[in-house]
């Protein structure tokens, strides 16, 4: 298994003010793993149209678990799969296909809704030598259309086009058609903070109009691109940009996490860690939650699922768990 940490970034506090608190409650102990089994670093969380929850986490190997809508364990998907090396994200598309983004194998894998068939692989897993993935920390190779380097997330538009955050090395977003053929890209291996530049695009979502939302983690901003990957705007005042999530439904919302970064001193836990609910234009609706090690707090929100904007699933990289939260009416 590839053992590599992400780049270290300084803590960035949210600067937005006057955002109301949203009433919420946690659902303690919602997920029920198999007896004697535990989650590791919980990298990805996703739901399908039936309410089943998928959790992609790091243990002695990358593992993808499926739970039903009550939190009961159903199955493990992809056990022993060649593309599972160092989990990073899982998403479910509108046809309920399951997509696993693996940072270690440099791949994005598409599985059938029941997880029984592998339907597509984007990227290329380097050869394995002595049980270790032989990858590099730089571009792999630089600026190619089909080779990824430590990808971080995946999303789709209404036409089925595929968007990949090619995150840790290549600092870009790549667009493919529904069959995996290259269409466009923005960004590049060189880190930057200007227009059409990224410093670790870590999270990725697409709304019903085809706009692309990028959690540009190293730049502590959320970048909005049009469907052709042309720059539109950025939201810069919501702190550390780890995760972005766009809800379903006629009125969509953008949820972003001001996550508490790895190694952040405990003294700052009371000022970081909120999840913000935004209109798609960046206008804040409210915020909830706080950083901490004990439920219902969280320690480094890595990914979120918000298919239902009133029920969020949150995956934590440092507390090795996933939690369910319900937003309540005031």
Regions found by a protein language model. Give the residues of each.
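Eukaryotic scaffold repeat domains enriched in small/polar residues
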Residues: 9-330
């Amino acid at each position: 298994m590839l053992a590599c940490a992400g780049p270290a970034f300084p803590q960035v506090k949210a600067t937005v003010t006057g955002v109301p608190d949203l009433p919420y409650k946690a659902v303690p102990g919602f997920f029920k793993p198999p007896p004697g089994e535990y989650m590791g670093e919980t990298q990805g969380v996703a739901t399908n149209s039936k309410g089943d929850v998928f959790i992609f986490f790091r243990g002695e190997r990358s593992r993808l678990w499926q739970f039903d809508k009550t939190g009961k364990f159903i199955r493990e998907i992809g056990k022993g799969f060649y593309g599972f090396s160092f989990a990073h994200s899982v998403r479910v598309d509108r046809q309920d296909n399951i997509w696993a983004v693996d940072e270690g194998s440099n791949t994005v894998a598409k599985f059938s809704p029941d997880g029984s068939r592998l339907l597509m692989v984007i990227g290329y897993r380097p050869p394995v030598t002595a049980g270790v993935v032989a990858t590099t920390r730089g571009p792999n190779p630089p600026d190619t259309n089909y080779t990824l380097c430590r990808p971080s997330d995946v999303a789709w538009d209404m036409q089925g086009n595929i968007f990949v955050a090619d995150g840790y090395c290549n600092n870009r977003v790549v667009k493919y058609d529904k069959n995996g053929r290259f269409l466009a890209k923005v960004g590049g291996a060189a880190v930057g903070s200007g227009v059409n530049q990224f410093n670790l695009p870590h999270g990725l979502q697409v709304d019903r109009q085809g706009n692309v939302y990028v959690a540009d983690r190293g730049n502590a901003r959320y970048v909005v691109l049009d469907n052709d990957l042309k720059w539109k705007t950025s939201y810069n005042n919501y702190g550390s940009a780890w995760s972005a999530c766009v809800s379903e439904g006629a009125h969509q919302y953008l949820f972003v996490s001001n996550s508490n970064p790895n190694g952040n001193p405990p003294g700052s836990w009371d000022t970081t860690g909120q999840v913000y609910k935004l209109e798609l234009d960046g206008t804040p609706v409210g915020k909830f939650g706080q950083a901490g090690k004990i439920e219902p707090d969280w320690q480094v929100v890595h990914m979120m699922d918000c298919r239902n904007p009133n029920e969020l699933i949150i995956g934590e990289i440092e507390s090795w768990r996933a939690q369910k939260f319900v937003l309540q009416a005031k």
